[in-house]
Structure formats: C-alpha cells, structure tokens
C-alpha cells in the first residue's frame, strides 16, 4: 500500500500538533520553580505592628495561628496557608 501525499501531510500535521500540545501544556503548581501563590497566603493588614521590628513577630504570630510560617510583604504580615 502506497502512502499518498494527503496521508503523509495529514500524518505530519498530526505529529506537529501532538508535539506542540505536549510542549506548551500548562505547568502545575507542583512544578519546580513556583513560589508562593497569592491564594496560598493569608495577609493581616489590620496588624502592621507585626512587621515593624522585623519578621520575628510575624513568624511567631503565624505559628500561633497554626500556619506554616510568616513573612512580611510590603510591611504587612502574611502567613503561608
């Protein structure tokens, strides 16, 4: 059975489509290189005093609330969920 030009072109386009689909797929949150996503932290704007003396108070505050850890972002204490 001979491969016709139409079949060959259809095969090539199919392969290219599959390769580009696999290559350009969305990355997941478990992929390396991702930092803390915005929805993965809880920020407490009502307590700016937690970041005035460094991040120590913010970390203790977050640990007291059973978060993993805390850090200051733009003067606001944010805890990782």
UniProtKB/Swiss-Prot annotation:
Disulfide bonds join 43-79, 51-72, 58-77, 62-78. GO terms for cellular component: extracellular region. The keyword Signal applies. GO terms for biological process: defense response to fungus; killing of cells of another organism. Residues 1-24 form the signal peptide. Its main location: secreted. It is found in: Secreted. It comes from the Eukaryota. Keywords: Antimicrobial, Disulfide bond, Fungicide, Plant defense, Secreted, Signal. Belongs to the DEFL family. This is Defensin-like protein 107. It comes from Arabidopsis thaliana.
